[in-house]
């Protein structure tokens, strides 16, 4: 078997690969990036490119190889990142024409799912977080998130037996693309990691050396990075494990970017007590940012509310949905700003028009700071900054505190705009080594070179005309290529007419190529000027870029202000277009919604077709609403829209209702639907009970609980018993109870309203017409004992004979005949009672005597007094 011959180039490759063992190495060779061995096999499958081999024509062992053109790098990188791979970009760092021996190469960047800066690899409307978790003693955990493209850096500590559950909840909230874990704790975190990778598709797990997870060195690293003597200013000094996680991220970013990360200027503590908390299950049930089925953005609350015009505003909106506020004062400040734009349409339209011309300043800033910004990025920044003075003029007309504060603090960055305007070419290329980066008039030396090059083209034309006249060869031409430089070309037929001082350089099939001393002298002057121009333009561009990078904090501050403006103006636009109204924010624990609508469902219906509903909850007589009624009537819609209206109000948003009085809530819980959670290996009933347990253990008197069926995953009697006990617990919790809306098919639960003054019965109005049912979708006071399941089955397309048979059986059951061996529909029925497993009921079955008495009553003829007497008589019969 042939042995592998190691060339100097492959020796260099092996050395670089050894330094970056957990990456796919993109190894630059001329105009291509090449991959070898296992990297080539893996990359060829992901990228869909041909796998070939090196050393085909030698007696050495063949090396698997594939390659991509250098100019197509970003497209192929996107595929690698989407596949969860880490890619090391290895470049030639010296000119091959001047290199002595093998060309020097270095890894200049490592691209991973969580550490990317190119727009082609990013979702403009979402953050791209890389995350680290740390575990200390006594069930203490640290968690940190960093988005290198926006500079956002978040840290948190968790303690207690629920620490890993808290971490998982935050992971599913912020959905990072990469998670860093100590290589020695992968097994300890296995369950959390498995759940995280299941709940967050595409999450990449990256092990890190365990020795880095040290508090002392982590603390020092953070102090050094932020140039402070204490982290108290960030509120993070006491977060031991959180600091470790944060330092792990900084170390990782420095390792992958191979450069300083000066735009990471602030560390923010995740203050869970300051936000309206919504757990992962409730976020999914309410479809805040993506749908349950398919995980699509379209059909979510975010998709309806997003009329933002900038990427910064879109990301801020998403964070506002995921982190609603609890602080009434902050909510009111947001509402006031939205209200200004709601009431001033001209200001709103003007601000939105200006914002629409602003690019992603946050991500442009990160590329500038990291040294990867190109000419088009600089042009985009210049065009964005050009709009700021006009925006400031509009803001000076505002009379709302929140907007006045933005007006007083908005940095229009006019000095940096002037620098960009003077220095950057109005139409620069993407490749910063191609020239045409710098505007004429910015640098005197560059201007001289440009004049020489421009005149040089005229000199070429003059020389060509002169040689044609001298030789009499009409089709003589002066041309250029990279191999021979400048040359004179004549046809073979005319080659005998060339002067003697012409020096033959190349013979072609139909032409001859020559040079002259005059042409060679010109070439030396012009080509040297071209090389000097390219190098000088690159140096000037890098200098301008570095100057902008030194103002990173100013760019980020302005970007944040613009994100706020976009959020406020777009919220007002949504409210105007969709007929939303300002909610009244209170601290009294009450909830009153008049003519409320579901923000997503109403957008899918023709205008005016959605049926609005009123909801009133308090901690006195309307603490728990037990809502009965058939499927398809709209119970679930009313429940979900109530939760969404509360959430929108605490975002600082107007709400889809004619009016709303919202008492600030601390948490929203939902137990909605029933499906097996195969991701967690849990059955329908286990999912229900896990979510219910979370509610019962964590809900407070300031919470809002949404229950859409409990107990459907088990037997009827078990389910009814659990639902009854859960409702009692919620009304009695902490002696105050919890505001709850409970939709159920257990009509027996309506009896709870007689036992507890704070429980009220409601139902969804239905109208019967002949044998069909019409759903009115209106929430009305009072319970119902009808589920209309057979009518719903008919609407769903169940065959008519099955529906008719179901009616017969239902009638027989209600009359007590079905289990007594009587005939139903002419068919003898088997005695079922002796086969039915015994299960105790919460309610004693009525006796035949009571049933007979009720049947004999003519309810239409009874007076109120007679009805009351009859009711007392029936009660006596039960004693």
Swiss-Prot record:
InterPro entries: DNA_mismatch_repair_MutS, DNA_mismatch_repair_MutS-lik_N, DNA_mismatch_repair_MutS/MSH, DNA_mismatch_repair_MutS_C, DNA_mismatch_repair_MutS_clamp, DNA_mismatch_repair_MutS_core, DNA_mismatch_repair_MutS_N, DNA_mismatch_repair_MutS_sf. Keywords: ATP-binding, DNA damage, DNA repair, DNA-binding, Nucleotide-binding. Residues 824-845 are annotated as: Disordered. Gene3D superfamilies: 1.10.1420.10, 6.10.140.430, DNA repair protein MutS, domain I, MutS, connector domain, P-loop containing nucleotide triphosphate hydrolases. CDD domains: ABC_MutS1. Signal peptide: none annotated. GO terms for molecular function: ATP binding; ATP-dependent DNA damage sensor activity; damaged DNA binding; mismatched DNA binding. One of its GO terms (biological process) is mismatch repair. Transmembrane segments: none annotated. This is DNA mismatch repair protein MutS.
